[in-house]
């Protein structure tokens, strides 16, 4: 039990040391973003802004251009030996679609309706022909008794049976 109390105290002390002692305000005026400090603003990483009014205010530019970065300020009065940081991250998505439950339900219902209409179209296009028997009924034995060829008959009633009448026939 003593070890867990010591360990939880150590974790708490580590987390509290990471907390900023004072807040750094991020302001939005019209369409621009500003970081404001009582003392000077220091850029750490991200969007490099323009310093304004005695280095206490940093203009990050238009919010539509997605300003982001980490900025530091030195403290004043009781926090004059402390330093605090703020992370700014704007994401102004102009081509995004807000996916709320109503939009999601609409997409799902539309998908189901389109699938059913497609299935109905395939069913109607590839519909069954009436009056036609199955393929097994179409096949019949043309020759019986395993004959390969059907013998020709002697008939002289057709127009083409007289064409080679003078030639001898092999029977």
From Swiss-Prot:
Predominant localisation class: membrane
Q: What tissue specificity is annotated for this entry? A: CD3D is mostly present on T-lymphocytes with its TCR-CD3 partners. Present also in fetal NK-cells.
Q: Which residues are glycosylated?
A: 38, 54, 74
Start and end of every ITAM domain? 138-166
Signal sequence annotation: 1-21
Give residues where Phosphotyrosine occurs: 149, 160
Q: Which domain of life is it from?
A: Eukaryota
GO terms assigned for molecular function: transmembrane signaling receptor activity
Q: Which InterPro entries match?
A: CD3_esu/gsu/dsu, Ig-like_dom_sf, Ig-like_fold, Ig_4, Phos_immunorcpt_sig_ITAM
Q: Does the keyword Transmembrane apply?
A: yes
Question: How does this chain sit within the bilayer?
Answer: Single-pass type I membrane protein
| Protein keywords | Adaptive immunity, Cell membrane, Disulfide bond, Glycoprotein, Immunity, Membrane, Phosphoprotein, Receptor, Signal, Transmembrane, Transmembrane helix
Q: Could you list which ranges are Extracellular topological domains? A: 22-105
Quaternary arrangement and interactors, per the entry? The TCR-CD3 complex is composed of a CD3D/CD3E and a CD3G/CD3E heterodimers that preferentially associate with TCRalpha and TCRbeta, respectively, to form TCRalpha/CD3E/CD3G and TCRbeta/CD3G/CD3E trimers. In turn, the hexamer interacts with CD3Z homodimer to form the TCR-CD3 complex. Alternatively, TCRalpha and TCRbeta can be replaced by TCRgamma and TCRdelta. Interacts with coreceptors CD4 and CD8.
Purpose of the protein: Part of the TCR-CD3 complex present on T-lymphocyte cell surface that plays an essential role in adaptive immune response. When antigen presenting cells (APCs) activate T-cell receptor (TCR), TCR-mediated signals are transmitted across the cell membrane by the CD3 chains CD3D, CD3E, CD3G and CD3Z. All CD3 chains contain immunoreceptor tyrosine-based activation motifs (ITAMs) in their cytoplasmic domain. Upon TCR engagement, these motifs become phosphorylated by Src family protein tyrosine kinases LCK and FYN, resulting in the activation of downstream signaling pathways.
- Give the protein name, as stated in the record: T-cell surface glycoprotein CD3 delta chain
Taxonomy, top ranks, is: Eukaryota, Metazoa, Chordata, Craniata, Vertebrata
């Amino acid at each position: 039990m003593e070890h867990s109390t010591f360990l939880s105290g150590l974790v708490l002390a580590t987390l509290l040391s990471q907390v900023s002692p004072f807040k750094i305000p991020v302001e939005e005026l019209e369409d621009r973003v500003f970081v404001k400090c009582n003392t000077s603003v220091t850029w750490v990483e991200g969007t490099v802004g323009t310093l304004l009014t005695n280095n206490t205010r940093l203009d990050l530019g238009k919010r539509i251009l997605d300003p982001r970065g980490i900025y530091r300020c030195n403290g004043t009065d009781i926090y004059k030996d402390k330093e605090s940081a703020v992370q700014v991250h704007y994401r102004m998505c102009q081509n995004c679609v807000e996916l709320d439950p109503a939009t999601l339900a609409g997409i799902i219902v539309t998908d189901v309706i389109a699938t059913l209409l497609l299935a109905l179209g395939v069913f109607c296009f590839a519909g069954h022909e009436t009056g036609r028997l199955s393929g097994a009924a179409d096949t019949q034995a043309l020759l019986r008794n395993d004959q390969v060829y059907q013998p020709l008959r002697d008939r002289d009633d057709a127009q083409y049976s007289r064409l080679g009448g003078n030639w001898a026939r092999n029977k």
